[in-house]
Curated annotation (Swiss-Prot):
PROSITE patterns: PUR_PYR_PR_TRANSFER (PS00103). Its EC number is 2.4.2.7. Pfam families: Pribosyltran. Catalyzes a salvage reaction resulting in the formation of AMP, that is energically less costly than de novo synthesis. It comes from Acaryochloris marina (strain MBIC 11017). It is found in: Cytoplasm. This is Adenine phosphoribosyltransferase. Homodimer.
Length: 170
């Protein structure tokens, strides 16, 4: 399936000079959405995944149904202040400042096999912060699954020891 045909380009969003890759049109297409989940399921079916970790917020959209298909649990990585129990937190750099991601301390038992899913790999900051969040849990990071990778932003370089699967590259 040609996923690029289901992803809308929005020039100058969220600011001038940015070409935004809008996945809402992919989400609206039942065949496209099914294809994404089925493709990731096929790619990871034999990997004995225990937990799919979805990064807020679009990682939730793909991560929960993928976890279901793989017979795995789903774990959300959230923005600050959204998780009610004890957390691990990781700050990461933005273009102008920093942000933080959080995960419950008991999200994945030690030794669990974990797959991280999100919609987009751009600079790699969010993905790298998520990998760092998982480290104190002593789980095995099997890899990352992304719908889109913006190759010109070199996000893979921040994940040098991780398997990365991107369904679409720009």
């Amino acid at each position: 399936m040609d996923l690029k045909s289901l992803i809308r380009d929005i020039p100058d969003f969220p600011k001038p000079g940015i070409l935004f890759r809008d996945i809402t049109t992919l989400l609206q297409n039942p065949d496209g959405l099914r294809y994404v989940i089925d493709q990731f399921t096929e790619d990871y079916r034999e990997q004995s995944i225990d937990y799919v970790v979805g990064i807020e917020s679009r990682g939730f959209i793909f991560g929960a149904p993928l976890a279901y298909q793989l017979g795995a649990g789903f774990v959300p990585v959230r923005k600050p202040g959204k998780l009610p129990a004890a957390i691990h937190a990781q700050e990461y750099e933005l273009e102008y400042g920093t942000d933080r991601l959080e995960i419950h301390q008991d999200a994945c038992p030690a030794g669990s096999r974990v797959l991280v899913v999100d919609d987009l790999l751009a600079t790699g900051g969010t993905a790298a912060a998520t990998a760092q969040l998982l480290a104190p849990l002593n789980c095995t990071l099997v890899g990352f699954g992304f719908i889109i990778e913006l190759t010109g932003l070199a996000g893979r370089q921040k994940l040098p020891d991780c398997h990365i699967n991107a369904l679409v590259e720009y």
